[in-house]
């Protein structure tokens, strides 16, 4: 498999060979879906909470007499049928959303995503994206010159300058290979990988 090598203007200067073990896999939609859903589920904190009829603060006084009003009988205003009452099946803060996915499936899913990105032309290689100063404008101008407005950058090393220069850019995410995740790969329109990061990706997902 070959992908484009981009210059500083975002133009393809040549093509580089990338390992088929990571970038030449078949597209496995069901596996990719499973990996993405599991990653999102495992990122949930599970701290949302609602109150049931016992936890709602309310008066125990009967709202109105049992008979003679023509209305349905009611015992407490905390009933789920009443406005401000408790939920019938509330979400509890100890709910666990964890989904287990083994390492072999995760690696295969990530490789399938990388392969599809390469086939669609959404994956490219750059020599380096190092910046000399932690100024956002420097990196923003570089991406503007490359005509990129939604990009995930996988760099071999994210130093302080690159981190500070990129953290305020909208729709730009710069990560090291170990922090690349399936959701970000699917989300961004373009994925740039430095040459040095390619070797790390090969070791991780081959």
Swiss-Prot record:
Gene Ontology molecular function: rRNA binding; structural constituent of ribosome
Coiled-coil spans in chain: none
Keywords: Ribonucleoprotein, Ribosomal protein, RNA-binding, rRNA-binding
Keyword Ribosomal protein: yes
Annotated family: Belongs to the universal ribosomal protein uL4 family.
Function, as annotated: One of the primary rRNA binding proteins, this protein initially binds near the 5'-end of the 23S rRNA. It is important during the early stages of 50S assembly. It makes multiple contacts with different domains of the 23S rRNA in the assembled 50S subunit and ribosome. Forms part of the polypeptide exit tunnel.
HAMAP family associated with the record: Ribosomal_uL4_B (MF_01328_B)
Protein name according to UniProt: Large ribosomal subunit protein uL4
Organism: Polaromonas sp. (strain JS666 / ATCC BAA-500)
């Amino acid at each position: 498999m070959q992908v484009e090598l981009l210059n500083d203007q975002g133009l393809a200067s040549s093509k580089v060979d990338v390992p088929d073990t990571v970038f030449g896999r078949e597209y496995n939609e069901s596996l990719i879906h499973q990996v993405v859903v599991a990653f999102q589920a495992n990122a949930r904190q599970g701290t949302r909470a609602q109150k049931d009829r016992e936890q709602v603060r309310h008066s125990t006084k009967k709202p109105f007499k049992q008979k003679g009003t023509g209305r349905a009988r009611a015992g407490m205003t905390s009933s789920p049928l009443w406005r401000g009452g408790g939920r019938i099946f509330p979400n509890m803060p100890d709910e666990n959303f964890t989904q287990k996915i083994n390492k072999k499936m995760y690696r295969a899913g990530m490789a399938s995503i990388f392969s599809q990105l390469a086939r669609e032309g959404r994956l490219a290689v750059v020599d380096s994206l190092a910046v000399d100063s932690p100024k956002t404008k420097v990196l923003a101008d570089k991406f503007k010159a490359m005509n990129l407005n939604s990009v995930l950058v996988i760099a071999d090393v994210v130093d302080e300058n690159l981190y500070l220069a990129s953290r305020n850019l909208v729709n730009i995410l710069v990560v090291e290979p170990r922090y690349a995740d399936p959701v970000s790969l699917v989300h961004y329109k373009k994925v740039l990988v430095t040459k040095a990061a390619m070797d790390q990706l090969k070791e991780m997902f081959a």
